[in-house]
């Protein structure tokens, strides 16, 4: 009889591995993940889909370091129009959004590119929250409109 108390799908529960088994995170691993995310987003753009919520929290990683983009709850098909204007007011992840999304509610593949830049910042800061010094929507919007950009993340070198 098979032991079903720890099925294969939950093999990564907290405490089921030893620290010595965990691989060290390297720059090449982060670059590999960044590349895979870019290819996934390139595929979505080729299918005329705007993700609308690209963030590190919406990236899954398989056992063999394959990246999967997930959470398509805010995704839109832009097959007939290269932009999507959001008309319904719902809570959105402002810190990951392009200026045109925050100010005008306009989403496009270019706004996904902005979000990808924030994901890169998350990767190379080892999952720090973007814009940690800004607490509210108005402050972020005003700073971005005045030209503010996040500084280089701590673990990115000049070549990245």
Regions found by a protein language model. Give the residues of each.
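Intracellular eukaryotic protein kinase-like catalytic domain
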Residues: 1-160
């Amino acid at each position: 009889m098979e032991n079903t108390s720890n099925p294969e799908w939950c093999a990564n529960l907290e405490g089921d591995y030893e620290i010595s088994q965990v691989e060290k995170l390297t720059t090449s691993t982060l670059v590999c993940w960044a590349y895979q995310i870019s290819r996934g987003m390139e595929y979505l753009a080729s299918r005329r889909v705007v993700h609308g919520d690209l963030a590190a929290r919406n990236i899954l990683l398989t056992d063999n370091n394959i990246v999967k983009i997930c959470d398509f709850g805010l995704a839109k098909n832009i097959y007939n129009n290269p932009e999507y204007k959001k008309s319904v007011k719902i809570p959105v992840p402002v810190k990951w959004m392009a200026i045109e999304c925050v100010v005008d509610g306009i989403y496009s593949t270019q706004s996904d590119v902005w979000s990808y830049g924030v994901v890169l910042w998350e990767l190379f800061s080892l999952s720090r929250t973007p814009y940690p010094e800004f607490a509210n929507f108005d402050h972020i919007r005003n700073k971005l409109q005045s030209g503010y950009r996040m500084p280089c993340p701590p673990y990115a070198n000049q070549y990245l």
